[in-house]
Regions:
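Short hydrophobic alpha-helical segments enriched in small aliphatic residues
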Residues: 6-8, 15-17, 25-26
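Helical scaffold of the NTase/Pol beta-like nucleotidyltransferase catalytic core
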Residues: 13, 22-62, 299, 335-336
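Catalytic metal-binding acidic patch
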Residues: 65-114
Length: 336
């Protein structure tokens, strides 16, 4: 008569062998994927190097800046290559091109002259997507050594840029907050109200990354969720995993407002600095100063007025210089 463990031993050995085989298969797949990725990266890098070698022969090209995934992240088979060029001073007919190198698309996103290079970078709003695109980039060729130092300085996000980015992001966040409330309370459509919570996730992530002194980029949402899942889950992971009930949406919207209140100091900073002369500023004046649209910034201005930080007033204006009819435009004033 066979003992129980005599029968069990071969089964245990077979199971152990099967587990080892699966582990070996997984390890082999991982190695193959790693090799495939290495080959792909090498191909993209070779394409970039090949194009740079060609550009070096053009005496008009002063510098080449590599941007996008190849400069700091991981490329995949459908990636393209992003570059920017600095050229000698001249009148340019085109400021961008889409070219091909080794059957890979290369986007020359901008072509700027040497004298206009600094002005171009300074024109980019601190924390904007273009700012982040170039901030994650690197100069891979230059005949002007001074460009290296200036480009690295450009990547630093100062306190003023940080505050401006938070202000403009808060403007967008307040818009989503109001839309969420409208579709929940007035339209009685909680599903569409939840859509605005999802849109708010990216804006909150931008503020979170910016508040840490980093330049927000395309991966801001991933970073913010990793750093603060407790905050982001209501607008990101939880909001994507199931349909919220009206009370859940209401709670998330209320948390959104409390989030803005916690960041009031940095949100109001650019506005109060601009209004420090205590003169009335129309919404048109404010939007021009911050290089945005009136309809985009009015919401956060009214929010600051509701909080008693600035006063909402009006100023008589004319639609055109030749208009006789005077109308009232919304304005704001800082009364300390």
């Amino acid at each position: 008569m066979k003992r129980a463990y005599d029968c069990a031993a071969p089964q245990a050995c077979n199971a152990h062998s099967l587990i080892n085989k699966r582990l070996n298969d997984e390890e082999m797949r991982a190695i193959m994927e790693k090799n495939k990725q290495s080959e792909l990266t090498g191909r993209y890098q070779a394409a970039a190097d090949s194009l740079v070698d060609k550009l070096k022969k053009d005496t008009n090209v002063i510098a080449v800046i590599l941007c996008g995934s190849l400069s700091y992240d991981q490329v995949w088979e459908k990636s393209d290559i992003d570059m920017a060029l600095v050229v000698r001073d001249q009148v340019l007919k085109n400021d961008s091109f889409c070219i091909v190198e080794d059957d890979i698309t290369v986007n020359i996103n901008s072509i700027v002259t040497r004298s206009g290079f600094k002005r171009y970078l300074e024109s980019l709003s601190g924390g904007s997507m273009l700012h982040s695109l170039y901030a994650r980039g690197k100069i891979i060729y230059s005949t002007d050594e001074s460009l290296y130092e200036y480009f690295e300085e450009f990547k630093i996000m100062g306190s003023d840029d940080r505050a401006l980015t938070v202000l403009l992001s808060a403007s967008e966040l307040y818009y989503y907050y109001e839309k969420c409330q409208k579709w929940l309370q007035v339209k009685e459509n909680p599903l569409y109200a939840q859509y605005y919570l999802l849109k708010a996730a990216e804006v909150i992530a931008r503020i979170e990354v910016c508040a840490r002194g980093e330049i927000p980029d395309r991966e801001a949402l991933v970073k913010a969720y990793e750093e603060n899942p407790g905050l982001m889950s209501a607008y990101y992971s939880d909001a994507m995993s199931h349909q919220y009930s009206p009370p859940e949406i209401r709670h998330a919207a209320e948390e959104m407002e409390r989030y803005m209140e916690r960041h009031l100091d940095i949100i109001k900073k650019p506005i109060l600095e601009y209004m420090s002369d205590h003169e009335m500023k129309t919404v048109t004046m404010i939007s021009k100063f911050f290089k945005t649209e009136s309809h985009f910034i009015i919401g956060i201005l009214e929010y600051l007025a509701e909080k008693g930080i600035i006063a909402k007033v009006s100023q008589t204006i004319k639609i055109t210089p030749k208009s006789r009819l005077a109308i009232e435009e919304i304005a704001f004033q800082y009364i300390n």
